[in-house]
């Protein structure tokens, strides 16, 4: 069972998800509308099984989940956190919440030396997020081809290619709180 870390800021609680968060996370992703919406079961399962490498943000005043990152430790690269989805409520955008969630995940997972994520070229917010993270923590980044359009079924509305972002190595500073 994952230790349920919780970080308190003026406006938010940053914490590891629980299976009870799966439904609200599904609602958040559905509300956002520009992410691939998976089954509600997958979010419940993700919040339970991959809690150590994921994060939710709860708004203090409304007690609503307003942010979520799903991640997992790459099975072939033990020092690499792979980020699958980044979701921020439209009511909370422009506050740096996605970056703060990534920084908190790095603080909680000290063994992480690299972050990877796939991003479509047209997804400017995610492009800016990962490049901005690399700049903020003063580390390297590499962008390479990963999934071509022909990797996806033709019935998938001609899914756009996905580029692989690799951020790192991380420079650890144990005395610095990240968010």
From Swiss-Prot:
CDD domains in alphabetical order: NAT_SF
Gene Ontology biological-process annotations: ectoine biosynthetic process
UniProt xrefs under InterPro entries: Acyl_CoA_acyltransferase, Ectoine_EctA, GNAT_dom
EC number, UniProt record: 2.3.1.178
Pathway(s): Amine and polyamine biosynthesis; ectoine biosynthesis; L-ectoine from L-aspartate 4-semialdehyde: step 2/3
Record-annotated N-acetyltransferase domain positions: 12-153
Domain of life: Bacteria
Enzyme class: transferase
Keywords linked to the UniProt accession: Acyltransferase, Transferase
A molecular function GO annotation: diaminobutyrate acetyltransferase activity
Protein's UniProt keywords contain NADP: no
Statement: the UniProt record of this protein carries the keyword Transferase: yes
Family: Belongs to the acetyltransferase family. EctA subfamily.
Protein name according to UniProt: L-2,4-diaminobutyric acid acetyltransferase
Organism: Oceanobacillus iheyensis (strain DSM 14371 / CIP 107618 / JCM 11309 / KCTC 3954 / HTE831)
Lineage start: Bacteria, Bacillati, Bacillota, Bacilli, Bacillales
